[in-house]
Amino acid sequence: MKHYEVEILDAKTREKLCFLDKVEPQATIAEIKNLFTKTHPQWYPARQSLRLDPKGKSLKDEDVLQKLPVGTTATLYFRDLGAQISWVTVFLTEYAGPLFIYLLFYFRVPFIYGRKYDFTSSRHTVVHLACICHSFHYIKRLLETLFVHRFSHGTMPLRNIFKNCTYYWGFAAWMAYYINHPLYTPPTYGAQQVKLALAIFVICQLGNFSIHMALRDLRPAGSKTRKIPYPTRNPFTWLFLLVSCPNYTYEVGSWIGFAIMTQCLPVALFSLVGFTQMTIWAKGKHRSYLKEFRDYPPLRMPIIPFLL
């Protein structure tokens, strides 16, 4: 059997970092990363980006050496991705924060609203309902992270956790401060507005969960397989007929419902910022589907049926 020689160079300086002799032709990039780690333990596999060109795209872990456009002596270029952290850890951290931060304002712990309001309770029903909805949303997210989601990438850059937590925790504190404030004013149209908003919130939360379950069933555990998602017997998944990322559609709908329920400006701004970011993600996933699958349904839009 013909073996390969693999030299790994620094993508910036072109310095030779490692030379691997007698590498099996069937070796994957993941296996080469493991071999590289033996000579450079500080660069564990998740930190490594190996590519054929210094400015090219990173090779996938499942790429096989003999199927790459290289000779028997392959030259790969290395870039350090920096310290990594697991997606699960990031999600648990960024979702647990809003849950507990909101409750601090709801229970009016000392030093927030003034001594005479410490541990007092709001007289408005909508305030208590908002706390239930907000808590339910993030408890759902935490449970989905632990038991539902299957991640195609195991890690992300450590710096992202600070950015993500600033966003989620900051907005949670901002909206909680006003919703639970002793001078908070209930919605203009009273109980009718709250009931309508609650219905929107509940429907969208059920829809979001249904989509996450449908996406989970598409990918076997431990696999990176990608398939076209289609509607199932669950009516909430029928939105797949019109959009590529209905989980984002339902998520935005949930926050719109919460904004209507509380009639609170910070919630409306959080909904707008979230919609903007999710639209960017949805467009990216939509493009990936179109590029990967020739038979991808042409009627679908990224996030809003017929529009966007």
From Swiss-Prot:
<feature type="transmembrane region" description="Helical">
    <location>
        <begin position="125"/>
        <end position="147"/>
    </location>
</feature>
<protein>
    <recommendedName>
        <fullName>Very-long-chain enoyl-CoA reductase</fullName>
        <ecNumber>1.3.1.93</ecNumber>
    </recommendedName>
</protein>
<keyword id="KW-0746">Sphingolipid metabolism</keyword>
<feature type="topological domain" description="Cytoplasmic">
    <location>
        <begin position="293"/>
        <end position="308"/>
    </location>
</feature>
<feature type="modified residue" description="Phosphoserine">
    <location>
        <position position="58"/>
    </location>
</feature>
<keyword id="KW-0256">Endoplasmic reticulum</keyword>
<feature type="transmembrane region" description="Helical">
    <location>
        <begin position="87"/>
        <end position="106"/>
    </location>
</feature>
<keyword id="KW-0275">Fatty acid biosynthesis</keyword>
<feature type="topological domain" description="Lumenal">
    <location>
        <begin position="263"/>
        <end position="264"/>
    </location>
</feature>
<keyword id="KW-0443">Lipid metabolism</keyword>
<feature type="transmembrane region" description="Helical">
    <location>
        <begin position="190"/>
        <end position="216"/>
    </location>
</feature>
<dbReference type="InterPro" id="IPR001104">
    <property type="entry name" value="3-oxo-5_a-steroid_4-DH_C"/>
</dbReference>
<keyword id="KW-0521">NADP</keyword>
<keyword id="KW-0472">Membrane</keyword>
<keyword id="KW-0752">Steroid biosynthesis</keyword>
<keyword id="KW-1133">Transmembrane helix</keyword>
<comment type="subunit">
    <text>Interacts with ELOVL1 and LASS2.</text>
</comment>
<dbReference type="GO" id="GO:0005783">
    <property type="term" value="C:endoplasmic reticulum"/>
</dbReference>
<feature type="topological domain" description="Cytoplasmic">
    <location>
        <begin position="1"/>
        <end position="86"/>
    </location>
</feature>
<keyword id="KW-0276">Fatty acid metabolism</keyword>
<keyword id="KW-0597">Phosphoprotein</keyword>
<feature type="transmembrane region" description="Helical">
    <location>
        <begin position="265"/>
        <end position="292"/>
    </location>
</feature>
<keyword id="KW-0560">Oxidoreductase</keyword>
<comment type="function">
    <text>Involved in both the production of very long-chain fatty acids for sphingolipid synthesis and the degradation of the sphingosine moiety in sphingolipids through the sphingosine 1-phosphate metabolic pathway. Catalyzes the last of the four reactions of the long-chain fatty acids elongation cycle. This endoplasmic reticulum-bound enzymatic process, allows the addition of 2 carbons to the chain of long- and very long-chain fatty acids/VLCFAs per cycle.</text>
</comment>
<dbReference type="InterPro" id="IPR039357">
    <property type="entry name" value="SRD5A/TECR"/>
</dbReference>
<feature type="transmembrane region" description="Helical">
    <location>
        <begin position="159"/>
        <end position="180"/>
    </location>
</feature>
<feature type="topological domain" description="Cytoplasmic">
    <location>
        <begin position="217"/>
        <end position="245"/>
    </location>
</feature>
<dbReference type="GO" id="GO:0042761">
    <property type="term" value="P:very long-chain fatty acid biosynthetic process"/>
</dbReference>
<dbReference type="GO" id="GO:0006694">
    <property type="term" value="P:steroid biosynthetic process"/>
</dbReference>
<keyword id="KW-0812">Transmembrane</keyword>
<keyword id="KW-0444">Lipid biosynthesis</keyword>
<feature type="transmembrane region" description="Helical">
    <location>
        <begin position="246"/>
        <end position="262"/>
    </location>
</feature>
<feature type="topological domain" description="Lumenal">
    <location>
        <begin position="107"/>
        <end position="124"/>
    </location>
</feature>
<feature type="topological domain" description="Lumenal">
    <location>
        <begin position="181"/>
        <end position="189"/>
    </location>
</feature>
<dbReference type="GO" id="GO:0030497">
    <property type="term" value="P:fatty acid elongation"/>
</dbReference>
<feature type="modified residue" description="N6-acetyllysine">
    <location>
        <position position="22"/>
    </location>
</feature>
<comment type="pathway">
    <text>Lipid metabolism; sphingolipid metabolism.</text>
</comment>
<feature type="modified residue" description="N6-acetyllysine">
    <location>
        <position position="60"/>
    </location>
</feature>
<dbReference type="GO" id="GO:0006665">
    <property type="term" value="P:sphingolipid metabolic process"/>
</dbReference>
<comment type="similarity">
    <text>Belongs to the steroid 5-alpha reductase family.</text>
</comment>
<dbReference type="GO" id="GO:0102758">
    <property type="term" value="F:very-long-chain enoyl-CoA reductase activity"/>
</dbReference>
<dbReference type="InterPro" id="IPR049127">
    <property type="entry name" value="TECR-like_N"/>
</dbReference>
